[in-house]
Curated annotation (Swiss-Prot):
Its cofactor is Zn(2+). This is Glutamate--tRNA ligase. Binds 1 zinc ion per subunit. Monomer. It comes from Shewanella pealeana (strain ATCC 700345 / ANG-SQ1). The gene is gltX.
Length: 469
């Protein structure tokens, strides 16, 4: 049997990290078993579902490279199918029309609560014949009243619900639209889903859905209910913990591999290994290894992983993601070094692509002024001689190579009988405007000869003005 999983978000907001982790687990289980992964948009909540949210979900999935084999399917385009099944169930007696008013239902629940009883529908219309009237009605599933529903959850083990505790679920509203719990069942059946991976908040839906599947004569899939994600304070993850949409992590400068690596470890482990390539995730991932305890989100760990991926990934690949941030920060990269060369130069220290983009600005455009602290320390009178001598040597360079630039810096220090730092630091501030950069010879090489000459002239003028002021 081919393994077939699905990710079925509701388009009422962005794709958040909890949803992204569920999608990843479902995707990995399919890929690890040479199966298929389906994307389904559960948009039956017509009031809250929006095209913008749907677009955000698709964008997030594409950015994470969680490709799907089928879909996206939209529940709102399948209403005819749901209504067809509801009509069959009414005819077969596995569902019935309920004419109870909202007022009667509310009174019933109040009385049950007063007696300390479980609040559920009392079956008033369960065995009554349909009325030949225009009275409004809902359609309820005739849930079994005896026995129990048992399923073996990949994460939580054996779970059992007594049928006596389950309600006769509404499967069609008064206006005729099918309900979420019913649509899910029909979709999983029609799409051949063999394993449902979802959040633990769906556990109570599972016995109802299993009973409907059995009533339809449909196969029951396997289930894996993953725990929620907590903030680092132990509370449910929310916006105050920085719980944001997946694309916000893109905007903040994270690589998709870093976020995926972090999310896969947020509840799953393989020995003591922390860093996983996508291929390793596919190789080692197993639903049975997911921890049933809730996991706490740790931004510091995510940053550490992101820094690792920026440093260790192919510079060309990192540059392809960096392009977005350069454009976002209005940095024109058409007049400067190759972006992959900038990545190679700066990746050692960068924690995020956003940070890397900001720190690379001087490679592509001139700066208005020198950093005050760096200039005060390194653009003093003693810097005038090394700056002037190096500029002379720079003008005589015919081959613009890293080796030639390094030799010019070394020759300047030798002729002036000073340490390399006495030449390198004034040059660094002159060329970048700041006190930190990659190796000064590499920095000068990437900035280019013309820009370097202009900036050294600017620095010489700055030092001369300080001396004369």
């Amino acid at each position: 049997m081919t393994v077939k999983t699905r990710f079925a978000p509701s388009p009422t907001g962005f794709l958040h990290v909890g949803g992204a982790r569920t999608a990843l687990y479902s995707w990995l289980y399919a890929r690890a078993n040479q199966g298929e992964f389906v994307l389904r948009i559960e948009d039956t909540d017509l009031e809250r579902s929006t095209p913008e949210a749907c677009a955000a979900i698709l964008e997030g999935m594409e950015w994470l490279n969680l490709n799907w084999d089928e879909g996206p399917y939209y529940q709102t385009k399948r209403f005819d199918r749901y209504n067809e099944i509801i009509a069959q169930m009414l005819e077969q007696g596995t569902a019935y029309k309920c004419y109870c008013s909202r007022e009667r239902i509310e009174t019933m629940r109040e009385e049950q609560a007063a007696k300390g009883e479980q609040q559920k529908y009392d079956g008033c219309c369960r065995d009554k014949a349909p009325r030949d009237t225009d009275e409004p009605f809902v359609v309820r599933f005739k849930n079994p009243t005896e026995g129990s529903v048992v399923f073996d959850d990949h994460v939580r083990g054996r779970i059992e619900f007594a049928n006596s505790t389950l309600d006769d679920l509404i499967i069609a509203r008064t206006e005729g639209t099918p309900t979420y719990n019913f649509c899910v069942v029909v979709d999983d059946w029609d799409m051949g889903i063999t394993c449902v991976v979802r959040g633990e908040d769906h556990i109570n839906n599972t016995p109802r859905q299993i009973n409907i599947l059995k009533a339809l004569g449909a196969p029951v899939p396997e289930y894996a209910h993953v725990s929620m994600i907590l903030g680092d304070d132990g509370a449910k993850l929310s916006k105050r913990h920085g719980a944001v949409g997946v694309m916000q992590y893109r905007d903040d400068g994270y690589l998709p591999e870093a976020l995926l690596n972090y999310l896969v470890r947020l509840g799953w482990s393989h020995g003591d290994q922390e860093v996983f390539s996508i291929d390793e995730m596919k190789q080692f991932f197993n639903l049975d290894d997911i921890n049933k305890a809730a996991s706490a989100f740790n931004t510091d760990k995510l940053i550490w992983l992101n820094q690792h991926y920026i440093k260790e990934s192919d510079p060309e690949y990192v540059a392809s993601h960096l392009e977005w941030h350069m454009a976002d920060q209005n940095i024109d990269t058409s007049n400067g070094p190759k972006l992959s060369e900038v990545v190679s130069a700066l990746s050692e220290r960068a924690k995020t692509l956003k940070e890397l983009a900001a720190s690379s600005r001087y490679f592509f455009e001139d700066f208005a002024e020198f950093d005050e602290t760096a200039a005060k320390k390194h653009l003093r009178g003693v810097a005038l001689e090394p700056l002037t001598l190096f500029q002379t040597k720079l003008a005589g360079l015919n081959d613009w190579t890293l080796e030639a630039i390094h030799q010019a810096i070394e020759d300047t220090a030798t002729e002036l009988e000073v340490g390399m730092g006495k030449v390198g630091m004034p040059l660094r501030v002159a060329v970048t405007g700041a006190g930190m950069s990659p190796a000064v010879d590499l920095t000068i090489f990437l900035v280019g000869k013309a820009r370097t000459e202009q900036r050294i002239s600017k620095a010489i003028e700055f030092v001369a003005n300080r001396i004369n002021s």
